[in-house]
Amino acid sequence: LKNILGGGFDLIKKAPTIEIGLARTPSWLGPRLSVALGLTVYNLEKYLKKSLHPTLGKTIGFRREFIAAQNCSTEGDLIDLILQSSCTPPFTPVMYRSGQAVLDGGLVDNVPIDGLSPSPQGAPKSEVLVLLTRRYSQPDYFVNELPGLRLTYIQPSSPVPISSWDYAHHELMPLTYRQGRADAGLAFSKGVFG
């Protein structure tokens, strides 16, 4: 991760707020059992219900927490936060934040719309662009309206070059970024945003 950040920590500190999502485990489960149960209910909901935004994890006690990258005081703190946000024992070591085990935020919902701030009532809706990493049974581009939010989803035109589990092939990240940018550019050129 230090190579990926490439000395850009100071730029991140000055950038618009970047919220990183963690999952707090149910109080009645340890971290390893939480991952097993979390992955099971997530995959059941994803493959059987085919839900874009799963809800079962929250029902059984997982809760999401968002932390601003800009709140990290050092590059090491940011690296720890990124690793905590993708913690999935036994595939990775158990990680703790403020003394409590934390897991990959995707165990709650891998499209973290619950961390968005809706516009106040009567104001124009906040526009949000969601670049998905896998295809769902939806059109290439679609919109979901929620109170105070207008979410525009863009599905990938082809499988993304890097897996969410792949920390070893950081050279694929720029390819993935370019694909997302190209897919969004195509959506813009087709008038998806208005």
Kindly give the residue locations of the regions a language model identified:
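Patatin-like phospholipase
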Residues: L1-G194
